[in-house]
From Swiss-Prot:
Matching Pfam families: Pribosyltran (PF00156)
Principal cellular location given in the protein's record: cytoplasm
Listed EC numbers: 2.4.2.7
One CC-aspect GO term: cytosol
Protein name: Adenine phosphoribosyltransferase
Classification lineage: Bacteria, Pseudomonadati, Pseudomonadota, Gammaproteobacteria, Pseudomonadales
Cross-referenced Gene3D superfamilies: 3.40.50.2020
Family of the protein in this entry: Belongs to the purine/pyrimidine phosphoribosyltransferase family.
Keyword entries, A-Z: Cytoplasm, Glycosyltransferase, Purine salvage, Transferase
InterPro entries for the chain: Ade_phspho_trans (IPR005764), Adenine_PRTase (IPR050120), PRibTrfase_dom (IPR000836), PRTase-like (IPR029057)
Native species: Pseudomonas putida (strain W619)
Gene Ontology annotations of biological process type: adenine salvage; AMP salvage; purine ribonucleoside salvage
GO MF, any single term: adenine phosphoribosyltransferase activity
Catalytic activity line of the entry: AMP + diphosphate = 5-phospho-alpha-D-ribose 1-diphosphate + adenine
Pathway(s) of this molecule: Purine metabolism; AMP biosynthesis via salvage pathway; AMP from adenine: step 1/1
Amino acid sequence: MHSEAFDLKALIRPVVDFPKPGVIFRDITPLFQSPRGLRYVADQFIERYVEAEFSHIGAMDARGFLIGSIIAHQLNKPLILFRKQGKLPADVLSEGYQTEYGEAFLEVHADSLCEGDSVLIFDDLIATGGTLLAAANLVRRTGAQVFEAAAIIDLPELDGSRRLQAAGVPTFCLTEFSLSEY
């Protein structure tokens, strides 16, 4: 698989002052409305991970589900859902974390992973790294290990990728935006 050059940033809409004043939200819905754009993103991740040694894909609630499920299907890997608090029906492990908007909790089914598993964790965007750090902690609490954290977008000025790397979690993103970039 080889993907031609593509202007991914053109399919990521900046929404000013959402969800609160001073924030530029990176809306990926135009990307999902573009079959060519979505195929490009999927192909980039598949090319990177097709021969990688990991056992599971973990996807973050909710936009991480969109790309994580495609990659899990294409790579024939089990998909583990990391959900916002109160959304999973069985026994869960829970981890609190800070987001750029406040405090939140992430949960995963307690029986989703076990010792020896290796998980590629996906989200749409890395900002402060809080969600993916919480997921990494949950993975480690099951006895599994984190293979890498991947996202479509990185906001490097918010230090999320650096925080993940400092916690022993390698990161990979397809593109990045500065906080003031439109």
